[in-house]
């Protein structure tokens, strides 16, 4: 009835390393994007400081291999590297110790071919989300599910900021996108920053968020109390 477009986490047609230029110039944009991707993957798979630093260097090298220089904005419009480029650099560097949790994490993303490997076959996530779009991650490992959601929200937040504020008509603001995270309890306790930022700032950009879960206590998971960012509640039947 909704004519939804259903995407499986296989060759997802958006690039988490894409460079989206914000309206307010941000120096060293490739470094910011690299740091966000690195932080998210490190958080999901609990990578140590040394592992995280190694991954960050691989991401930065991937940008340079595509001719993208962090301090040269004129190069930022070149096609960005994909995760597959990063993985190839990582596996091809004999100085990097393999056989640890970092390699396992990267190999999982590579083996499942979650993201499209050719940047020419990718598009803006914000443009992709036209009509009803479902990313069906059921049946995948929990860590991989969390990683896909977190990376997608990271990219969505960056592109939301770049698009700028939505239109105002009197006191009413245009609604441009609505995000629904089903079974959100699996994700909330991880404390990913992009979700909180979208909840706090999304109104200005016409972006709404629906978090669906079975217990009220899930909204207070971890160090964050997500309930304070929610203005509308729909309660059907909860055990707590």
Residue ranges of model-derived segments:
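Conserved ATP-driven motor cores of ASCE-family P-loop NTPases powering translocation/secretion/packaging/pilus
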Residues: 196-240
């Amino acid at each position: 009835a909704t004519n939804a477009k259903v995407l499986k986490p296989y060759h997802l047609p958006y690039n988490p390393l894409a460079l989206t230029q914000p309206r307010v110039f941000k120096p060293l944009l490739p470094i910011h994007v690299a740091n966000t991707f690195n932080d998210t993957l490190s958080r999901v798979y609990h990578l140590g400081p040394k592992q995280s630093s190694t991954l960050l260097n691989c991401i930065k090298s991937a940008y340079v291999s595509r001719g993208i220089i962090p301090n040269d904005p004129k190069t930022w419009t070149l096609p960005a590297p994909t995760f597959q480029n990063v993985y190839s650099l990582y596996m091809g560097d004999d100085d990097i110790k393999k056989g640890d949790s970092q390699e396992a994490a990267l190999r999982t993303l590579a083996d499942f071919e979650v993201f499209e490997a050719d940047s020419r076959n990718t598009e803006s996530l914000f443009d992709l989300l036209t009509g009803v779009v479902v990313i069906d991650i059921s049946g995948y490992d929990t860590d991989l599910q969390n990683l896909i959601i977190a990376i997608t929200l990271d990219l969505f937040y960056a592109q939301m900021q770049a698009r700028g504020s939505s239109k105002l008509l009197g006191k009413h603001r245009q609604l441009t996108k609505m995000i629904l995270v089903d079974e959100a309890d699996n994700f909330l306790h991880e404390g990913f920053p992009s979700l909180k930022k979208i909840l706090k700032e999304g109104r200005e950009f016409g972006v709404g968020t629906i978090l669906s879960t079975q217990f009220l206590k899930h909204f207070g998971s971890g160090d964050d109390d997500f309930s304070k960012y929610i203005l509308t509640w729909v309660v059907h039947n909860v055990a707590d």
